[in-house]
């Protein structure tokens, strides 16, 4: 059994830590780098600067901290190893046990400035070690401040999603396990909110999502970060500071102290003054270690693009998986319904490799279990963009993007799931012919993305549309899921802001029908996109009054050309249609507008007048609310008859009275007296009837009690003999008898029987008296 430490040993430990902190602070102040400086690149022959040898020559105390007697504090702004930094012994031991010895470029550039207490805005390629670049400063900051459980929250790390927050928390556990700090991972969509509220005030480090943290700030008792918080870290800062998290982040930052250290890291960093002012960055150090690099992606990443028609994407994906059964593949799709549908269908078709899917609607524990299973061996993971940022999985061989990303930054984050930490990886993206503009943007000089075009091998392309259709017949629920996948994909394309790449009008009706057939659907689902007129392409607007459209706030329907509408087989499902039912049948459009989307045009008046866009309401039209004129004079209500003529307000309910009709008051009073007399007679009858009913109820109750008493007496007579008979006779003499009027004959017979019995008893007594005499 381990013996507890004595008070003297604990005191010696505190003194030793105080001396170490004092030496570390002196070292940091003496050797801190100048603002705006960056470490020089390392030469291949040496792994550390020249002054590293002097630092290793015995000018160290215990654990690698320079002793006070040495009188020197080596510079650490250009070191290459973690043990050359002014770090505590506990942090160095944790790094060594976790296997971290050499620093990456972002760590060499960011750690010296972060250890000095400066705000840092860091950007580096995916997989370059950004997480460790802020974990170490957090641990050292709290250690030098002698932070303990009673001090409360000292650091908050914000993450855009649950999975990345869990990954950051694991790094804190590995590196800081020798420290005595308490840490918690606080994310949404998981159970245990009450348990979190009970312990959150005792936590020193919180790794959380903005929404969950804001919930605790508003609901948890005594949870206050306005005075004690020391350091704020935002990972994937460009996404956290995006408009999707804007309100949450602003509310969180408003409750934090103004004096603090702030660290921001991401692969695609923002330098917007407005965004940086929101998190109160003060004179930050801008660190972009790969800013001068020739590529924005890792050098070990091979990137390919393939032009694939929309209806051939699933066939191409299936063929690709069948040719790479010994690989670990990550597949990105644009919507949750697509992920579910492709996963379920491919699972039924059995490609010969394990399949998994992950999306944002899963519980946090389920997501963690799926990630752990995906790390084990060869597998295919279908995912939404929840997996695109920050998650670290080793040895991902291929990243396949079936759907086009919304921008260059998302593309970089997606392909960054492979080729991490100088390992090799490959990425492939499927682009429709209508999306070739994205390929031009990827190959542009400012993007720095070396991507190669790869032609599909049609000979090895496997057609699985019929197989998918047979699966949908066997599993009807998958057919509904396929319809939703079809709708959500078109909706995702329609809602994208970059219309140079995502323009739904470039797709023809044949494309939609073929895409639905590739999903195994027997008919093409109907969808309705309601949009404002400002989203209608200008080349399809003709002579429409643009100024009038800008003033209008009513929704407008974008419909498909009626000439191409006949090529589709309509579906009677519960999906809205992309086009409304046409009000006119004679619609003539130019040949160049066939099979494309164009604004609905009214043909009510076509006599040499410019065509105007007809405003169509939604399926359920709401009635316009009428306003009451409060300034109108009283008594001015107006009503109309069936012919539209004005009538007095109460004329419609008044009775028409002839001119010869006269009201007779005597007849009215006579009728009233007659009714009163009838009511009095009925009252008398009702009272008599009520009395009779009460009398019968009372009699029935008495008879019931009598029968019960007689039964008890009969039972007692069997046990007590003649004594019981005497009691019965006595009781019968003193009690009254009640008989119904309908049973008079029975009562007379009973009286005769009683007289005979009395005579017999008297005779028996007489005989007994003679015998005794």
Curated annotation (Swiss-Prot):
> Can you state which reaction this protein catalyses?
ATP + H2O = ADP + phosphate + H(+)
As annotated in the record, motif DEAD box runs over 235-238
Instruction: Supply the domain comment.
Output: The Q motif is unique to and characteristic of the DEAD box family of RNA helicases and controls ATP binding and hydrolysis.
Q: Where is the Helicase C-terminal domain?
A: 309-462
Q: What does the record give under GO molecular function?
A: ATP binding; ATP hydrolysis activity; RNA binding; RNA helicase activity
Q: Which PANTHER family match?
A: RNA HELICASE (PTHR24031)
SUPFAM superfamilies, alphabetically?
P-loop containing nucleoside triphosphate hydrolases
Single GO BP term: rRNA processing
Annotated protein name in UniProt: DEAD-box ATP-dependent RNA helicase 32
Q: Which protein family is named in the record?
A: Belongs to the DEAD box helicase family. DDX10/DBP4 subfamily.
Q: Does the keyword RNA-binding apply?
A: yes
Residue positions annotated to bind ATP are 124-131
Keyword annotations for this protein, in alphabetical order, are: ATP-binding, Coiled coil, Helicase, Hydrolase, Nucleotide-binding, RNA-binding
Question: Which Pfam families does the record associate with it?
Answer: CTE_SPB4, DEAD, Helicase_C
């Amino acid at each position: 059994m381990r013996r507890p430490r004595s008070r003297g040993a604990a005191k010696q430990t505190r003194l030793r830590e105080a001396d170490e902190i004092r030496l570390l602070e002196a070292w940091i102040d003496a050797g801190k780098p100048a603002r705006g400086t960056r470490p020089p690149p390392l030469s291949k022959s040496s792994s550390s600067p020249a002054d590293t040898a002097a630092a290793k020559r015995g000018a160290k105390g215990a654990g690698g901290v320079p002793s006070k007697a040495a009188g020197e504090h080596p510079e650490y702004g250009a070191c290459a190893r973690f043990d050359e930094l002014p770090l505590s012994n506990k942090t160095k031991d944790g790094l060594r046990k976790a296997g971290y010895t050499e620093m990456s470029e972002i760590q060499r550039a960011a750690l010296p400035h972060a250890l000095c207490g400066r705000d840092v805005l860091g950007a580096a390629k995916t997989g370059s070690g950004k997480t460790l670049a802020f974990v170490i400063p957090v641990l050292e900051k709290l250690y030098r401040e002698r932070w303990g459980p009673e001090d409360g929250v000292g650091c908050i790390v914000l993450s855009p999603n649950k999975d990345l927050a869990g990954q950051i928390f694991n790094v804190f556990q590995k590196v800081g396990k020798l420290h005595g700090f308490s840490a918690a991972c606080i994310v949404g969509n998981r159970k245990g909110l009450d348990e979190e509220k009970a312990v959150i005030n005792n936590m020193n480090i919180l790794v959380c999502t903005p929404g969950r943290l804001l919930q605790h700030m508003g609901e948890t008792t005594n949870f206050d970060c306005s005075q004690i918080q020391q350091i704020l870290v935002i990972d994937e800062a460009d996404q956290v500071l995006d408009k999707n998290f804007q309100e949450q982040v602003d509310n969180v930052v408003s409750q934090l102290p103004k004096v603090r250290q702030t660290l921001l890291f991401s692969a695609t960093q923002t330098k917007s003054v407005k965004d940086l002012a929101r998190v109160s960055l003060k004179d930050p150090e801008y660190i972009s270690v790969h800013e001068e690099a020739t590529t924005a992606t890792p050098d070990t990443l091979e990137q390919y693009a393939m032009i694939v028609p929309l209806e051939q994407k699933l066939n191409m994906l299936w063929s690709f998986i069948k040719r790479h059964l010994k690989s670990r593949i990550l597949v990105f799709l644009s919507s949750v319904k697509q992920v579910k549908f492709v996963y379920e269908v491919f699972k039924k078709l059995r490609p010969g490799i394990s399949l998994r899917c992950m999306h944002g609607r899963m519980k946090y524990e389920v997501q963690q279990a799926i990630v752990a299973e995906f790390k084990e061996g060869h597998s295919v993971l279908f995912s939404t963009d929840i997996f695109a940022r920050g998650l670290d999985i080793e040895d991902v061989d291929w990243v396949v993007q079936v759907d086009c990303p919304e921008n260059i930054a998302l593309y970089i984050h997606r392909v960054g799931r492979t080729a991490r930490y100088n390992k090799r990886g490959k990425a492939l993206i499927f682009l429709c012919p209508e999306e070739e503009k994205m390929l031009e943007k990827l190959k542009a000089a400012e993007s720095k993305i070396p991507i190669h075009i790869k032609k599909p091998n049609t000979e090895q392309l496997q057609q699985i549309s019929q197989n998918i259709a047979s699966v949908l017949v066997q599993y009807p629920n998958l057919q509904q899921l396929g319809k939703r996948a079809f709708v959500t994909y078109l909706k995702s394309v329609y809602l994208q802001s970059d219309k140079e790449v995502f323009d739904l009008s470039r797709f023809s009706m044949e494309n939609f029908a073929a895409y639905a057939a590739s999903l195994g659907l027997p008919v093409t689902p109907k969808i309705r996109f309601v949009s404002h007129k400002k989203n209608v392409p200008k080349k399809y607007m003709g002579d429409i009054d643009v100024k009038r459209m800008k003033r209008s706030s009513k929704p407008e329907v974008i419909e498909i050309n009626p000439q191409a509408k006949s090529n589709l087989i309509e579906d009677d499902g519960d999906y809205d249609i992309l086009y409304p039912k046409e009000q006119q049948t004679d619609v003539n459009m130019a040949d160049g507008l066939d099979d494309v989307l164009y604004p609905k045009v009214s043909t009510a008046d076509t006599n040499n007048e410019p065509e105007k866009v007809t405003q169509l309401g939604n399926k359920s039209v709401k009635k316009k609310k009428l306003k009451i004129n409060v300034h109108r004079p009283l008594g001015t209500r107006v009503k109309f008859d069936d012919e539209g003529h004005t009538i007095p307000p109460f004329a419609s309910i008044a009775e028409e009275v002839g001119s010869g009709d006269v009201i007779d008051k005597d007849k009215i009073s006579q009728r009233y007296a007659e009714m009163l007399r009838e009511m009095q007679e009925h009252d008398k009858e009702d009272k008599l009837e009520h009395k009779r009913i009460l009398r019968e109820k009372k009699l029935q109750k008495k008879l019931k009690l009598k029968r019960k008493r007689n039964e008890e007496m009969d039972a007692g007579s069997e046990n007590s003999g003649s004594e019981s008979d005497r009691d019965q006779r006595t009781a019968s003499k003193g009690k009254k008898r009640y008989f119904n009027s309908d049973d008079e004959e029975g009562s007379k017979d009973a009286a005769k029987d009683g007289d005979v019995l009395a005579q017999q008893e008297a005779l028996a007594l007489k005989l007994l008296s003679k015998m005794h005499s």
